[in-house]
Design a protein with these regions (language model features):
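Conserved functional hotspot residues or short segments at active or partner-binding sites
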Residues: 1-8, 338-502
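Amphipathic, well-packed alpha-helical segments that form the structural scaffold of globular domains
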Residues: 4, 8, 30-34, 38, ...
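Extended, domain-scale alpha-helical bundle/helix-rich regions
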Residues: 1-62, 67, 71
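Conserved catalytic motifs of ABC-family nucleotide-binding domains
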Residues: 95
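Polar, glycine-rich mid-to-C-terminal structural blocks
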Residues: 274, 286, 291-364
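A generic structural motif
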Residues: 68, 133-137, 337
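Conserved phosphate-chemistry cores used by DNA topoisomerases
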Residues: 13-19, 248-252, 300, 333, ...
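Cleft-lining beta-strand/loop regions that shape enzyme active-site pockets
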Residues: 18-23, 43-60, 76-81, 85-87, ...
Length: 503
């Protein structure tokens, strides 16, 4: 009933506004055309383009709150970013209802039962100020004027931790995306942020380092190249070939390394694009042990261009202003290849030490997507010097022995096979109870263990975190999540094995 009510409200919102209806039909049509070329060519209305770029940026111009439309059509505030304009106003609180919006031009916009995308369009508009009317839980109405400000994107923050297991210290850095500053607002870049975390972790006396790229869907290719260069002295990182063009070698832009010790990279089926670039490059150099399950298999390059007949790509400087009303297109320009000439396209990166993962049962990879571009190779002379081969066979044997004695991974392997069977069965039960059981098997997960090892921050971060209650709470949650992760534990043990074997 709730789902039906949501659909009914959405359709009613669209149909009540002719312009919104025209936009909805136009968006569907243009998205369908774009998707017929390859999975990553996509039409973006202006607000979707902004949201996409924001997801890959460390800082954005925002008001600093998120909304949710309830089943009855009311729009509620569900979270507020500390330090943002909404937070600093002191007049907007979680669970407040958003009643109306007044733009800088004086246009009043009713909020209840707003059509999908209508509010997104308002908040992503280049206009830097709005007046909101909110209603608190006691019924009080408050008018709040907000001015956009630079707000940190918490989801893209790089955080480094020390993992202590059996008296050995391993550095751990999770990288959620290859973000960068897209415009004049600047902000941090992921390669630079990772380098800073490594410096702090080295001061803690780490003996090895884990870079977690699981669920990292990619982002800025230049950042991926710079990140790879942190771990090698100099040399080529990837080969790129645009449609009809020659193959170009892209190299590490800086000589020297930030970290030259034992390195492991965690990947899974949702590690894509730039993540695969980094994992593949460091694998080809024998620089890192790749741990986990096969990656997604995307090795294509995209760029976002305006649908504006006055725009000339050949004369672009990056400072042009565009007609945003026509939208934008994210278009595939070419393919990325490994320095060996091989490709991760469709194939993904094969881990050196494989760990079972339920994500393998979903079969959601580049290969499964309609119109995915084929995999091929390129012939180009590339000169690079690999490090000595890693003791992969010994690492695989030791890891396999541990997995065979691990109740968690034994249960996980069993569940993986069961889930694969259920997923392969295309017969969906229509009886409610049978469907519920079928769905539970599809979405089943193994309960994480708890407190597998000690996790703590570098001393520099600890002092800063203690100054902020919100930061302290979020940090405690992250530490707990890491310490309960059996994949991180096994990866840390593999790093300990590597250190022992190389001694």
């Amino acid at each position: 009933k709730q789902l039906a009510a949501n659909y009914k409200r959405s359709f009613a919102g669209i149909l009540s506004d002719q312009k919104e209806l025209n936009n909805a039909i136009s968006d569907i049509y243009l998205k369908s055309i774009a998707a017929s070329y390859d999975p990553h060519t996509e039409f973006f209305p202006a607000e979707e383009k902004d949201a996409f770029e924001e997801s890959l940026s460390s800082n954005n111009m925002k008001f600093g709150f998120t909304l949710n439309q309830a089943n009855d059509g009311d729009v509620e505030v569900v979270s507020i970013v500390p330090g943002s304009p909404a937070w600093n106003s002191g007049s907007i609180h979680v669970n407040d209802k958003l009643v109306s919006i007044k733009t800088a031009g004086g246009r009043e916009i009713p909020v209840k039962n707003a059509a999908p995308g209508q509010l997104d369009s308002v908040f992503s508009d280049p206009s830097q100020s709005l007046e909101l009317t909110v209603q608190s839980s006691d019924g009080k109405l408050t008018a709040v004027k907000l001015q956009k400000a630079l707000v940190s994107n918490e989801e893209n923050f790089v955080k480094g931790y020390v993992i202590e297991l059996e008296g050995k210290k391993t550095g751990y850095i999770a990288l959620p995306s290859f973000y960068s500053g897209w415009d004049e607002n600047g902000g941090g870049s992921c390669a630079n942020d990772v380098a800073k975390e490594i410096v702090k972790l080295k001061k803690e006396g780490i003996e090895s380092l884990l870079l977690d790229l699981r669920y990292n869907g990619g982002g800025n290719v230049e950042e991926a190249i710079e990140l790879s260069g942190i771990f090698i002295d100099a040399g080529p990182i990837l080969l790129a070939k645009e449609t009809g063009g020659k193959t170009t070698t892209l190299k590490d832009p800086s000589r020297g390394t930030i970290y030259d010790g034992p390195l492991g990279i965690l990947i899974n089926g949702q590690s894509a694009s730039a993540s695969e670039l980094v994992a593949g490059a460091l694998q080809d150099y024998n620089r890192a042990v790749i741990i986990g399950s096969n990656s997604f298999g995307k090795a294509t390059m995209q760029s976002i261009l305006p649908i504006d007949t006055t725009f000339d790509l050949n004369k672009a400087t990056g400072k042009e202003t565009f007609n945003r009303q026509n939208g934008f297109v994210k278009i595939t320009l070419g393919k990325i290849y490994r320095i060996t000439g091989g490709s991760n396209q469709l194939n993904g990166v094969t881990p050196d030490v494989k760990l079972p993962d339920l994500i393998e049962a979903t079969d959601y990879t580049e290969r499964s997507l309609p119109y995915a571009l084929p995999s091929d190779t390129v012939m180009k002379k590339v000169f690079y010097t690999t490090l000595k081969p890693l003791p992969l066979q010994q690492l695989q044997q030791r890891s396999s022995q541990r997995l065979a004695g691990s109740e968690y991974f034994k249960d996980l392997s069993k569940q993986l096979q069961e889930t694969k069977k259920v997923t392969a069965d295309n017969n969906v039960p229509l009886q409610w109870e049978a469907y519920r059981q079928w769905r539970e098997k599809q979405t089943a997960h193994i309960q994480n263990k708890k407190n597998l090892f000690k996790v703590y921050n570098a001393a520099f971060d600890t002092k800063l975190i203690e100054l902020n209650d919100f930061e302290r709470e979020q940090n405690a949650i992250l530490q707990k999540t890491i310490s309960n992760d059996a994949f991180v534990e096994e990866a840390a043990r593999i790093m300990m094995d590597l250190k022992t074997i190389n001694q």
